Amino acid sequence: MSRINLTLTAFFAGSLLASQASAQSMEETIAKAVSPLPEDLRAEATVYRYNEDTGERITLRAGSNHVECTPTDDEGFTWCYPIRDRERRDLSAKLAAEGLEGEALQTAMQAAEDAGAIEPMAFGSIIYRRFDTPDRIQYLWVIMMPDATAEELGMPTGRQRDNALAGKGTPWMMRPGTSGAHLMIPING
């Protein structure tokens, strides 16, 4: 076999292997993205990510149920949300691409909600989260409770993110009295 034929054969074989590895990698990415969900929601969940520079949504797998998930981010978090709140996440991604973060991003999102540009989170809607560090809460359910207070619902507000808890904390409320009020429920067994 000539050197050119060997080179071409090696190139095409390498390309084929790379495309198979890429497809397998995408399958693994999607499987990990839906892993925070209960088993019966995984197969039909949409999986997407955002272009960090533009905030544009990129669909990795179109689903047919009421939940959508993002692949694990650089910090080790994997999130799944109700589709109802898609516009909210899309706006957040666009604002983040413009350089907003932290409290400034939350303030901008609140202003958009107050102006009617995005709907408030539905009371009782659930967000599923997974985190890849064993000394923290790996699986967490976040129950949205806009404008609720800890006092009216009888909920604790003490954070359960202490590493000494080894990821086995108890539920607690965050951002009470705001439109972003929510209950954090650890699911780590």
Residue ranges of each PLM-predicted region?
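Bacterial N-terminal signal peptides that target proteins for export
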Residues: 1-9
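N-terminal signal peptide c-region/cleavage motif recognized by signal peptidases
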Residues: 18-20
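Primary mode marks residue(s) on the alpha4-beta5-alpha5 output face of response regulator receiver
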Residues: 24-189
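Bacterial N-terminal signal peptides
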Residues: 9-16
